[in-house]
Structures are given as structure tokens and as C-alpha cells.
Amino acid sequence: MKTLTVHTPSHSYPIFIGNGLLPQAGSLLKPHLGKRAAIITNETVAPLYLGTLQTALDAAGVSHFSIILPDGEAHKNWQTLNLIFDGLMQNRAERKTTLIALGGGVIGDMVGFAAATYQRGAPFIQIPTTLLSQVDSSVGGKTAINHPLGKNMIGAFYQPQAVLADLDTLHTLPARELSAGMAEVIKYGALGDIGFFEWLEQHMPELMALERAPLTQAVYRCCQMKADIVAQDETEQGIRAWLNLGHTFGHAVEAEMGYGVWLHGEAVAAGCVLAARLSEQLGKTSAADTARLAALLEAAGLPSAPPVFAFEKWLAHMSHDKKVSGGIMRFIGLNRLGEAVITEITDTDILRRTLQPYL
């Protein structure tokens, strides 16, 4: 097992990474749990891992109840959030009841937002079961639900008490979900660590085969990079925005196609290539770097191009992006592979040229 600590102005917390951790969850998480816990999961994850977690909490003497939600990005909304609140209130959850998010990024984001707002703040723990959530969404305290006009538009910064990433849970992931998570892994190398990017180029077949040693190394490095960035910029006033590489274009794809039609990681993959193409238009990164990024994404089974839709729709979706400031769109681009840069775009003709093959 590998452990690292996230340090933020609000508080610090551990991330546990390894195999076979879920059966040990009671003992590992006991210092971060109250006397009672609410396990919140979905219909897909519950049959796989809920029983194991319940047994682990029983062994640690932690009482608990469970709330099981529908699965999928299409349910990341007010209606499903209210199901969490219904379950908490029906089970008389108190402010010190610990909410445990058992699932992927959708569960983690919604449970975190529920924790941030239930009785004005209850503790919560992340137990991510997808690659995307283990390397990205479970760490750093971003919580949210979607709005029909934009992804993650309603939310809060609210840090968990702990994160437990059991890599064994990745063996039950569908291949498409594994690839989607790998988009975020590749993103880290592209935005801030060319050495890691090169390592990914060399080890992608082993990673996709879930070989234990390289997988542990990759998840640890991603969490380490995110922890370092979040420690410097908890509420995304500066460099934390780098972590949104590919997301401005990607969120537009998700909103246009309908949440869940393209998986988040698939949309981010296409978005990363578009961000590199935009950087080319601005005279920053090279066509060779863009091609190299696209090739690595494709090696992970990911799309390197977005679906086709009208430029006006791209602009409409991107105008709702959370990085827009003073009406000016801000994109995360690349000076070169391994070096992200925040770019303000006032000339939409540059965006049109970037997107021209997909209009």
C-alpha cells in the first residue's frame, strides 16, 4: 500500500492506494470515521462491493446504513441529490454522521456536495471504484451536480476526510470505463510532467492490462500531482485550472451529446487534442506534440476527435464554462507537452479554425 497526504488550508487528509484495501476499510478509515456512517453507492457498484464495505465497518464497530442510487452521468442532478437527502433524513443522520461515497466520479461528486450542504456540512470519505475517480475526481474537494445548461455548474469546494483507492475494484470496470479513466492519467503527463508522459507511452499496454506495479505507480503519480497542485491552489484561483486541460471542449461535447452518451473521459480525450490544436493556432505547441498526444490517447482506446456539430453550439456551451471571466473564455492549452498554460481567447475565429474539421 502507498499513502500520501493532501495538505490544504481547510485541512489535511490521507490517500490510501493499493490492492485489497476494501476489506481493510474499517481499520484504515476508523480514525476518520464517526460512530455512524451512511454508505452511498449506486445500483451497479452495490452488488459488487457494498457487502465487503459493510463487513469491514461492522468489524470496526461502526454502525451504518446504505443509500443506493441510479447509475450514470444522466442522474447527476437535483433529483438524485434529493434521494441522498431523503435517505439521510429518513435514517436520522446527524451532522457528525460520515457520508461514504462508494463508486465512481458521479457518486463522489454528488456525495461530496450532499456532505457540504447537509446540515451545513457533514464529514465524508471517498472510496473511488473507477480509474477516473481514483486518479482525479476523488482528490481535491471539487463537488457538484450538473445543470442542463452546463456540467458541474452547481457545487462546492469541500474536502473529504480520507480517500481509499482499492485498485482491485478496477478489475470489474468495463473496458470503455477503463479507457475513460486513462484519459485523465494521460492528461496529467501532458499538463505537467513530460517524464511521466514518456513513461505512459512505454507502459500503456501493461496499464490497460491492469498489471499491478505499473498501475499502482500511475495512480500514485496522478494523485501526487493533484495533491501538489491543490495544496497551492485549493479553490482554483490559479494553477489548479491546469487540471482542466481538455475540459472546456470536453464539457461542450458532453452537454451537446447528452450527459452519459460520451463518457467524461472520452470527451476529455477529444478535448485535450482540441486544446493542443488551439495551442498550435496560437503558435505555442507543435503539430508533432499534438500528434503524439493523439497517438497515446488512441493507444488507450480513446477518441482523438470530437463529434461533429455546429460552431454556434460549441460557443454556446463553452460560454457557460466556469473558467469564463468577464465574458472572456479561458482555455488550458500547452506551451509544449508537459507544460500547461492558461490562455484567454477573445477572437472566436481562432476557435473556428481549431474546430473547422469537426463542424
Curated annotation (Swiss-Prot):
Cofactor note: Binds 1 divalent metal cation per subunit. Can use either Co(2+) or Zn(2+).
Record GO biological process: amino acid biosynthetic process; aromatic amino acid family biosynthetic process; chorismate biosynthetic process
EC number of the protein: 4.2.3.4
Entry binding sites for Zn(2+): E184, H247, H264
Pathway stated in the Swiss-Prot or TrEMBL entry: Metabolic intermediate biosynthesis; chorismate biosynthesis; chorismate from D-erythrose 4-phosphate and phosphoenolpyruvate: step 2/7
Keywords of this entry: Amino-acid biosynthesis, Aromatic amino acid biosynthesis, Cobalt, Cytoplasm, Lyase, Metal-binding, NAD, Nucleotide-binding, Zinc
Cellular compartments per GO CC: cytoplasm
InterPro entries: Dehydroquinate_synthase (IPR050071), DHQ_synth_AroB (IPR016037), DHQ_synth_fam (IPR030963), DHQS/DOIS_N (IPR030960), DHQS_C (IPR056179)
Cofactors required: Co(2+); Zn(2+); NAD(+)
Binding site for NAD(+): 71-76, 105-109, 129-130, 142, 151, 169-172
Family: Belongs to the sugar phosphate cyclases superfamily. Dehydroquinate synthase family.
Localization annotation: Cytoplasm
Name of the gene: aroB
Catalytic activity: 7-phospho-2-dehydro-3-deoxy-D-arabino-heptonate = 3-dehydroquinate + phosphate
Job description of the protein: Catalyzes the conversion of 3-deoxy-D-arabino-heptulosonate 7-phosphate (DAHP) to dehydroquinate (DHQ).
GO MF term (any one): 3-dehydroquinate synthase activity
Name of the protein described by the UniProt record: 3-dehydroquinate synthase
